[in-house]
């Protein structure tokens, strides 16, 4: 015959973690979670999780097939953008910018879709204040198209954008040959 759980004077069972049951709750003994998976969705997460010595935290990268969008800085701007044989779409972004993260998949798609016709680079707003000032970037994300080392008139675009609107924005700019 099984005995019923003990009760207190009020007739109720003691709270599950009270010493009345003879067990004590130990820190760290409550819940042990397995480590996070090595992949998220269809992408494999790679890259450092912590800040490098003396530097800012670097966001994890997503590994994809096709063209990659590179981050460049002030020192690479002239060679990568102004001296490029291809038109270059510069995406000014910041890691704290929500709309920048929203359009990142669209920009990645465009790098693959227009590979060979267009180069796309990203510039970190916080790490490149001279470029931000020189090109008068007031909102994020900001897109500016450069051809033959000059900004294409009417190519500036600020804010999040859908893939369809991105194509509507980019196609006419790639077909024109006018520069400022």
From Swiss-Prot:
One of its GO terms (molecular function) is protein-disulfide reductase activity. It holds the Pfam family Thioredoxin. GO terms for cellular component: chloroplast; cytoplasm. PROSITE patterns: THIOREDOXIN_2 (PS51352). The keyword Nucleotide-binding does not apply. Residues 65-175 form the Thioredoxin domain. The record marks 91 as: Deprotonates C-terminal active site Cys. Keywords: Chloroplast, Disulfide bond, Electron transport, Plastid, Redox-active center, Transit peptide, Transport. Disulfide bonds join 97-100. The keyword Transport applies. The active site is at residues 97, 100. Residues 1-64 form a transit peptide. It is found in: Plastid, Chloroplast. The record marks 98-99 as: Contributes to redox potential value. Thiol-disulfide oxidoreductase that may participate in various redox reactions. Possesses insulin disulfide bonds reducing activity. Belongs to the thioredoxin family. This is Thioredoxin X, chloroplastic. It comes from Oryza sativa subsp. japonica (Rice). The gene is TRX-X.
């Amino acid at each position: 015959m099984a005995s019923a759980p003990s009760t207190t004077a009020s007739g109720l069972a003691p709270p599950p973690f009270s010493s009345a049951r003879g067990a004590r709750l130990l820190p760290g003994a409550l819940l042990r979670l397995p480590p996070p998976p090595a992949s998220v969705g269809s992408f494999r997460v790679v890259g450092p999780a912590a800040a490098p010595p003396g530097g800012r935290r670097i966001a994890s990268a997503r590994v994809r097939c096709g063209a990659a969008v590179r981050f460049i800085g002030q020192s690479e701007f002239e060679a990568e953008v102004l001296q490029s044989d291809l038109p270059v779409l510069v995406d000014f972004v910041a890691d704290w910018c929500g709309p920048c993260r929203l359009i990142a998949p669209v920009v990645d798609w465009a790098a693959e879709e227009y590979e060979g016709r267009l180069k796309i680079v990203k510039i970190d707003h916080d790490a490149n204040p001279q470029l931000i000032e020189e090109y008068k970037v007031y909102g994020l994300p900001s897109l500016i198209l450069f051809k033959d080392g000059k900004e294409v008139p009417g190519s500036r675009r600020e804010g999040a954008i859908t893939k369809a609107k991105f194509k509507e924005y980019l196609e006419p700019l790639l077909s024109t040959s006018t520069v400022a």
